[in-house]
Amino acid sequence: SRNGRDYITMGLTGGLAPESPGLGNMDHLALVTMTETGPVIGNVLMNGITDKRGAVPVMEDFLLYRPRQITQTGHSLGIRSVPNLRDLGGYKTSDGRIIRNGLLYRSNQLSEISEADMQVMSSLRLKNAYDLRTLAEREARPEELPETAQYVVLDVLADAEQANPAMLEKLMQNPEEANATLGDGKAEAGFIESYRQFVSLPSAQREFRNFFLGISNPEELPALFHCTTGKDRTGWAAAAFLTLMDVPREKVYEDYLKSNDYILPAYKKVIDGFVAAGGEENIVTAILGVRKEYLDAAFDEMESRYGTIENYFAQALDIDAKEQQQLKEIYLY
């Protein structure tokens, strides 16, 4: 540090070095300057060559040296066009270990990412992006990905008789019909049933198995997974992952409910327009937000069928104890 605000950081690509969680694959050095809005990369040194790219925002957990202890727990990356993009690292387990930052990200869809935000996204050096959406959702809003990321489709709701996301989007265009169809608690009841299906549907079990096996390969990290708004299918995947890592249940819910902090403000115009056209606010927030009762339903389904998260992984997802332990060794330190 020259002035208490500038720091040298290494390997902004993530990695598995146990002594430096979140650092690894160290192929460059960067001068990071602390600004009022957070740390930014200034001149980047690539193999001894100064690359004057200008300021690029980065997360403080990438800094090799920090002037104070910073706890990055399920933090947002602050990418405005992808508001629910968050790092799943930083959570502490019941036995005191911590999930590594920079390896696994949860997100909403990437179809509307801006060019400037794509540059920031590219700095994550993603290897895989897992899309949990239905075919109709993917066709309506095709994926936009960084060049480094391989696109993997995992249609969790393929076996659902009627995939709720497509139906709900149509109803949102007609507030009067939405009131009749989804009022009096019907919207919440529909989501509760969907969350049970995340556990019980054959397609959900198949695709969540593929997801967890995919993120258990260190060579395929960092990785990102998402659905449409990054709260329901993504929410259960994140909750199951954190629970398997032995993160306390209250912290699992804390991470899950954070979607309300990012998605509802991002959809404020949609919500206001729906209500102005005669729609019930409780309906639209039930659709676009998350409720504790939704995740309760998924956990209830999991526990009533399998008893424990370990049994859910072993019996529903066919991921045995050895493979579960491998996941923990990758993500925990």
Regions found by a protein language model. Give the residues of each.
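Histidine-centered active-site/metal-ligand motif
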Residues: 1, 226
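Extracytoplasmic/secreted cell-surface and envelope-processing proteins
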Residues: 18, 51-52, 138-141, 235
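Binuclear metal-dependent phosphoesterase catalytic core
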Residues: 2-66
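Cys-dependent protein tyrosine phosphatase-like superfamily
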Residues: 60-224, 237-333
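Ser/Thr-glycine-rich phosphate-binding loops at phosphate-binding pockets of nucleotides
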Residues: 229, 233-234
